[in-house]
Amino acid sequence: MARTTPIERYRNIGISAHIDAGKTTTTERILFYTGVSHKIGEVHDGAATMDWMEQEQERGITITSAATTAFWSGMSQQFPQHRINVIDTPGHVDFTIEVERSMRVLDGAVMVYCAVGGVQPQSETVWRQANKYHVPRIAFVNKMDRTGANFLRVVEQLKTRLGANAVPLQLPIGAEDNFKGVVDLVKMKAINWNEEDQGMTFNYDDIPADMVDICEEWHNNLIEAAAESSEELMEKYLGGEDLTEEEIKGALRQRVLATEIILVTCGSAFKNKGVQAMLDAVVEYLPSPTDIPAIKGINEDETEGERHANDDEPFAALAFKIATDPFVGNLTFFRVYSGIVESGATVYNSVKQKRERFGRIVQMHANKREEIKEVRAGDIAAAIGLKDVGTGDTLCDQNAPIILERMEFPEPVISVAVEPKTKADQEKMGIALGRLAQEDPSFRVHTDEESGETIISGMGELHLDIIVDRMKREFKVEANIGKPQVSYRETIRTRVNDIEGKHAKQSGGRGQYGHVVIDLYPLDPEGPGYEFVNEIKGVVIPGEYIPAVDKGIQEQLKSGPLAGYPVVDLGVRLHFGSYHDVDSSELAFKLAASIAFKAAFAKANPVLLEPIMKVEVETPPEYVGDVIGDLSRRRAMVSGQEATDFAVKINAEVPLSEMFGYATDLRSQTQGRASYSMEPLKYSEAPKNVADAIIEARRK
């Protein structure tokens, strides 16, 4: 089957923005103008096509990136048909994992900004992710019809807050209620869309008289940006010659692909103005799969390999999202980097080292799907029937195995206990949590050995709320949520010698007798955690009872004498004791050992250890004082600061118990413009006042 669209006419793009910049509405308009969707879905009616999970429609926010395919030939049908694969990405900070994951598989991105709110905090996080993966991008300043809309202010913020070399491609005609259309600064013509057919048709008109001067000024700014692409064009420009439209567009495209500039378009998706011209910009300025460097990977022999966007190379694809579909089970979204694969073919999962069979392959439009026979280099599609494929796995030709760059996923930062409301929910909850963890690598589940509770961990409070909500809706599991928990540990600080433990019951008949003498000493935290040394000389204690002594002490380690937390980093030396021919038994020596251990532990300067997190906060410079002040109140040790042009990174070590609710506090301190990450670092001694309070609470 031949390729229907040449790969040079593919555009794999993400639409990315802060919550409420109007990103989902923008995507809806793309689907409408490209002829995919006949009735425009409005977010504020809860009917948007891309937001297909129930919680998304209720909360009006996008949680899962739905991938969809559309075709576009230009506003005036001026191009051959291009295939645009659109990935809609979430804009909430608890879902950055989804954004990060889709950045991996995109070739270009459209950053949507609100003309009133401008560059918001999450836009800064998304921007950093796009930089990390060198994604060429253009900007769309949306909501030009809103009160307070100001296009040039947003362009300025792109420069100052993000350090972007922002170059307007258009200027708005009017703003707020008076927003009429845009001026195309390359053609120097006004574009007015027809309101009667929801903007499907438009006219090129002369630039309004009161805008001629400002348009000239920004037209020159655009030409200058184009001329900087090569010495040849620069000479032509400085020599006073006019550049042709082709030269201008070619030069701008070259600079966008090199991520040297970001072209800025504008409009109001809600009012059906501007998205059409932004689609033209996607085709004209964003890369096709062949414009970006070959993807790197690791061959079977650990050498570096790569795959070019070419049908003739061996098949290689990256699974970037797993979604559970109510009708077909798991859908694995994947991006094909090279080669061709047909439905029914067997491929190799090089990360798990297993073979997988592609059952059916579907192309998604939001959550409707169309079955296709094959996919080729550059395609984005979803497979049904893959058994054991996780996010970030590589699917490839069995005869040419390669592992494409692995994605790095952040460690979860918050944990809570969940318990099913009824016995019937118990088993269903296990299945539901397993499914959700497979879909979302930033969500983890484990059973706490000490309490037996099921603990779920994720990227923030909203993240876990939504997980619990999905358990309820999709899997019909009712669960109660506990308070966030911290795991403490206990240990000793000084050595104690010759501590005795005796268990004797000898009041006639078969008695019980065990007697041990031990030393207790601290071990290095990097060491084994526990050691038992038997130094019994002669037969003061017969050899068969020695393991019972060790076992008696190990049982005590599970729940320490201070507050019932696990005991770590200590050693025991057994060096004396006595026994009775008739009354001694394993049980008696186990009990004697536990008596000796408790007595020794109490004298060995016992302390409580608390988990310390390594925390990194990235904040605009103006909030550094507030952020550090707040961290100090949380008993943080700030270990360093590092400033870039637009943000300051603060590194600190903070006790986990002080970090609950931090995401919310940090948002309010910095108007939501800071982001943070944290990971477990070490255990260290809790200050006396903190330890006393914890011990007191546990004893109640």
UniProtKB/Swiss-Prot annotation:
SUPFAM superfamilies: EF-G C-terminal domain-like (SSF54980), P-loop containing nucleoside triphosphate hydrolases (SSF52540), Ribosomal protein S5 domain 2-like (SSF54211), Translation proteins (SSF50447). It is found in: Cytoplasm. GTP binds at residues 17-24, 88-92, 142-145. Residues 8-290 form the tr-type G domain. It holds the Pfam family GTP_EFTU_D2. GO terms for cellular component: cytoplasm. PANTHER family: RIBOSOME-RELEASING FACTOR 2, MITOCHONDRIAL, TRANSLATION ELONGATION FACTOR G-RELATED. This is Elongation factor G. Catalyzes the GTP-dependent ribosomal translocation step during translation elongation. During this step, the ribosome changes from the pre-translocational (PRE) to the post-translocational (POST) state as the newly formed A-site-bound peptidyl-tRNA and P-site-bound deacylated tRNA move to the P and E sites, respectively. Catalyzes the coordinated movement of the two tRNA molecules, the mRNA and conformational changes in the ribosome. One of its GO terms (molecular function) is GTP binding. Belongs to the TRAFAC class translation factor GTPase superfamily. Classic translation factor GTPase family. EF-G/EF-2 subfamily. NCBIfam families: EF-G (TIGR00484), PRK12740.1-5 (NF009381), small_GTP (TIGR00231). Keywords: Cytoplasm, Elongation factor, GTP-binding, Nucleotide-binding, Protein biosynthesis. GO terms for biological process: ribosome disassembly. The lineage of its organism: Bacteria, Pseudomonadati, Pseudomonadota, Gammaproteobacteria, Pasteurellales. PROSITE patterns: G_TR_1 (PS00301), G_TR_2 (PS51722). Its main location: cytoplasm. Disulfide bonds: none annotated. InterPro entries: EFG_II (IPR041095), EFG_III (IPR009022), EFG_III/V (IPR035647), EFG_IV (IPR047872), EFG_V (IPR035649), EFG_V-like (IPR000640), EFTu-like_2 (IPR004161), G_TR_CS (IPR031157). It comes from Actinobacillus succinogenes (strain ATCC 55618 / DSM 22257 / CCUG 43843 / 130Z).
